[in-house]
Amino acid sequence: MRTFTTLALLSAAVLTAFAQQEPTFRATTQIVSVPTTVTDAQGRLVPNLEQDQFSILDNGKPQQITFFENETQPFTVVVMLDFSGSMTANLEFLRRATEQFLLRMLPQDKGMVGAFSDRIEFSGDFTSDRDDLISALKELQYGNPTRLWDAVDQSIDMLKPVEGRKIVLAFTDGDDTYSKIGFGTVLDHAREQEVMVYAIGLQSEYFNGQRKVRSQPDRSLRKLAEETGGGYFELKTTDELGPTFTRVAQELHSLYTIGFTPSALDGKEHKLDVKMKTPTQTARARKTYVASAARLSNTN
């Protein structure tokens, strides 16, 4: 039986790792790195674009793109799943869909799985072993209340010592009911750590002991995904779970990276806007960055 690490031990491990290894996004080279997803008018991913198809604005001012990459880059992901009481009837559907995501990870990708209810658990260290991740997925336990924001926040914590592209993939079928922190704190934390959040929300029905209740995913998840450059998917049936988890894997392997040198390192939060020259194409990227030399990307 796999032993799941307690929150206290996880926090200690994260702090130790962070002290030993600084993430790429804390290097002092003056490049703002912006992972970007491009879709067409039908929502399909657009591959094989070149640098001249993009433009980027910093506080509304066009910037010269000084770094561009259109090759698949490895990512590190925390897959955090709602295993609260409202999901009891749908847990097997969720596990199978999550397996589809894990099976599509490339050898250089790393991940861990976790679950939240009235407690939060993680599978251990990040690994590229998909079989280990699938085995860990089967051992996650379910509970009752929904600690959504606590779970996402702690997932971001797990990514602190990680270099490169950092992802939280969160799934829920309802509102947060039990967290100690709120949405605003989680958003600030994700921005600070430059973590992309992908969120999948499912509308579902469950029996609360007295009557059938229809749950709705927390509406703030959409804003969290939009602000961090991830994606938000709201589903009406469990049949959509598999294709949606597969779509997220495809997106993560189809990201472009755009970089520019900021004109002023004023330590302030700046607004970012990535635009496409083809009118039928849409770019999705994080909305802000902090113009501080200590918080910009190292492209070496």
Give the role of each language-model region.
Residues 18-300:
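Scaffold/interface architecture of coatomer-like assemblies
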Residues 5-16:
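Bacterial N-terminal signal peptides
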